[in-house]
Swiss-Prot record:
Pfam families, per the entry: HGTP_anticodon, tRNA-synt_2b, tRNA_edit
Protein name (database record): Proline--tRNA ligase
GO BP term (any one): prolyl-tRNA aminoacylation
UniProt keyword list: Aminoacyl-tRNA synthetase, ATP-binding, Cytoplasm, Ligase, Nucleotide-binding, Protein biosynthesis
Subcellular location: Cytoplasm
Gene: proS
CDD domains according to UniProt: ProRS-INS, ProRS_anticodon_short, ProRS_core_prok
């Protein structure tokens, strides 16, 4: 491909308010342009990268026996109504009516539609197992699209779905996908972790996410370097050291205008660990709920929501109305509303908390004696907490979710009547799994993990081109002749390892060398071949590796072999 014929609108100045490195570099290097909030146009270079990623996806899906199909983006509402998600998914779903007034939606995922076709066509155990997949557009009305292509309103997704006769079959399909995902992300050049995750709207069974660590990530993952424990912070667990008891006398203590745990602990000269933090929330399902954690711990809202459903924190007015107590002095003793206490509160230890009386706290509170509660893990794991598996220190990293796998069981097959007859002629629901990868997120994560001050450094497997030839003097006949000769020869070389020809970009623009060098580093092709009059005086061309910036001069007659060798040596 000739640079002069390719549309690569590089930018020098980036609009303000853009922070993610991948967003900045995709704009600067001419890979994407933004149409509106959360809507992006993939330009030729960007589309080539997505196609490279999609090729890897297809190769690995076919390797596990998955069959490619294509589902509509426009869905009739009644299918979503049968599973209940029409009602539980709120503003994120694009909804519309057709000209007859029929309710429709734009697909944000395809569990319902895939299950619908399975319900119509799969009738016998002889037709199972099945794995179907597609690489197709999804739409989600994100409240705050951000991070460039990391969180958008329209995106491409590889989504696959497994259908099995039993739970053992689902385990096999789930593991096949996990193994395929490891191969996919390794081939794409990503550093990643497979972590335990919250299934969210997908169900309530086992699920994992594949996370690419980067400071630009909007997720946080908890990791143990000692044993390999890994989990999204939304579900992560940790152990806390046993707290020695101070055996407080059970009595009220005067704490004038001291409302927060820190204020009271400083006032009394005691560690926050000896306090019970008492929160009041309003649950859509349960109404008012008292939530208790050890004073030095923070609430994990996702964990609590899995227990009580969606909730909001009570205002001062609501607290007074419900409990007759001002916020800051609420405690767990004496209230008859639902209570949930975190495991960080030890049952045999005496604590201090609000006395349910303005300007007073109560000390000597012993859980199980002075109050009862539902006990649960509702706290947020912190850096340096102890690993729940091996007891060593945990660390927390930011990461980008690039893929996920879910065990769905019969969550969709039962309401949509996707049943089959087993060997004994008994009707049973199909057991289902769902698996997704976002190609644009993979591309963005690759940039976040592979860049420098000059631009992108593509892993060679997903680079838009393999090699860039850079003739420096387009008015010099010999320079142009050698560049064209190398362009033809390298393009024709059959790459037996990748089962394809080398894809070569030649920068045939009549531009200054500095401009060509700057653009080459910006767009990030792995190997650069520099051809100039100075080198040709010695009958040599220069090979530069974009990642290491290592250069070497090779003779023109050996250049083709050296170029190919350099390509295979690079990452």
């Amino acid at each position: 491909m000739r640079y002069s014929k390719l549309f690569i609108p590089t930018m020098r100045e980036i609009p303000s308010g853009i922070n993610a490195i991948s967003h900045i570099l995709m704009l600067k290097a001419g890979y994407v342009r933004q149409l509106a909030a959360g809507l992006f146009i993939f330009l030729p270079l960007g589309w080539r990268v997505l196609n490279k990623i999609n090729m890897i996806l297809k190769e690995e899906m076919e390797r596990i026996g998955a069959q490619e199909i294509s589902m509509p983006i426009l869905h009739p509402a009644e299918i979503w109504q049968e599973t209940g998600r029409w009602y539980t998914i709120k503003e994120e779903m694009f909804r519309l009516k057709d000209r007859t007034g029929r309710d429709m939606c734009l697909g944000m995922t395809h569990e319902e539609i895939m299950t619908w076709i399975a319900s119509k066509e799969i009738k016998s155990y002889r037709q199972l197992p099945q794995i179907w997949y597609q690489i197709q557009t999804k739409l989600r009305d994100e409240a705050r699209p951000r991070g460039g292509v990391l969180r958008t309103r329209e995106f491409i997704m590889k989504d696959s779905y497994s259908f099995d006769i039993d739970w053992e079959g689902l385990d096999k399909s789930y593991n096949l996908h996990a193994e395929a995902y490891h191969r996919i992300f390794t081939k794409c050049g990503l550093k990643y972790y497979q972590v335990e995750s919250d299934p969210g709207i997908m169900g309530d069974m086992e699920s994992h996410e594949f996370m690419a660590p980067t400071p630009a990530g909007e997720d946080e993952i908890v990791l143990c370097d000692s044993c390999g424990y890994s989990a999204n912070i939304e579900v992560a667990k940790s152990e806390l050291p046993t707290l020695p008891s101070l055996n407080f006398e059970y009595k009220e203590i005067y704490t004038p205008e001291k409302k927060s745990v820190k204020e009271v602990s400083d006032f009394l000269g005691l560690s926050e660990k000896y306090f019970i933090k008492t929160l009041i929330v309003i649950s859509e399902k349960n109404g008012p709920v008292l939530v208790m954690l050890r004073g030095d711990q923070e609430l994990n809202e996702k964990k609590l929501a899995r227990i009580i459903g969606e909730f909001s924190f009570a205002t001062s007015e609501q607290a007074l109305e419900i409990l007759g107590v001002e916020l800051g002095f609420v405690g767990p003793v004496g209230h008859k509303i639902k209570k949930i206490a975190d495991f960080s509160i030890q049952k045999e230890i005496s604590y201090i908390s609000g006395a349910n009386k303005k300007n007073y706290h109560l000390q000597g509170i012993i859980p199980g004696i002075h109050f009862d509660a539902q006990w649960a893990d509702i706290r947020r794991v912190k850096e340096e907490d102890r690993c729940p598996k091996c007891g060593n220190s945990l660390k927390i990293e930011k990461a980008i979710e690039v893929g996920n796998i879910f065990k769905l069981g019969t969550k969709y097959t039962e309401p949509l009547h996707a049943y089959f007859l087993d060997k004994d002629g008994k009707e049973k629901p199909i057991i289902m799994g769902s698996y997704g990868i976002g190609p644009a997120r993979v591309a963005a994560a690759a940039i976040e993990q592979n860049h420098d001050s000059d631009g992108i450094i593509w892993p060679k497997s997903i680079s838009p081109f393999d090699i860039e030839i850079i003739p420096l003097n387009m008015d010099d006949e010999k320079t142009v002749s050698i560049a064209e000769e190398l362009y033809e020869k390298v393009t024709e070389i059959y790459n037996s390892f990748a089962d394809r020809h080398m894809e070569v970009l030649i920068d045939d623009r009549d531009e200054r060398p500095g401009v060509k060098f700057k653009d080459a580093d910006l767009i990030g092709i792995p190997i650069q071949i520099v051809i100039g009059k100075k080198g040709l005086k010695e009958n040599k061309v220069e090979i530069k590796k974009r990642r290491t910036k290592e250069t070497k001069k090779v003779s023109v007659n050996k250049a083709v072999v050296e170029i190919v060798n350099s390509y295979y040596e690079t990452y």
